[in-house]
């Protein structure tokens, strides 16, 4: 077994144990929203097992606008699947390549 492969297995087990421990801490009626960076990442892969848990939303490729939207949702109400999809679409629209945005103001460097 190559050393890197062994370390990868150890890391995967650690992530799996951490995710399981975290999820065990929630009551069945608790809403759980998981925001991960990479769909193919190890953390997302471990949370994927909980995708059918009631009141659980798992979103990969998250960005700060999405995190803000989720945090600002009304407390005491479950977020619907439709609302989560809306928030994901809104967050996608916030990703911009700023160099392509037209400059309508004066540029002092010119």
State each model region's role:
Residues 53-70:
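Short, acidic/small-residue loops that bind anionic groups at enzyme active sites
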Residues 31-37:
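Acidic beta-strand-to-loop metal/phosphate-binding motif
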Residues 104-110:
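Short acidic DE-rich linear segments
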Residues 12-20:
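Structural motif
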Residues 41-54:
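Short Gly/Thr/Asp-enriched flexible loops that form oxyanion-binding sites at enzyme active sites
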Residues 29-31, 54:
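Short coil/turn segments at beta-strand junctions that form active-site/ligand-binding loops
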Residues 73-101:
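Short, glycine-/small-residue-rich phosphate/pyrophosphate-handling segment
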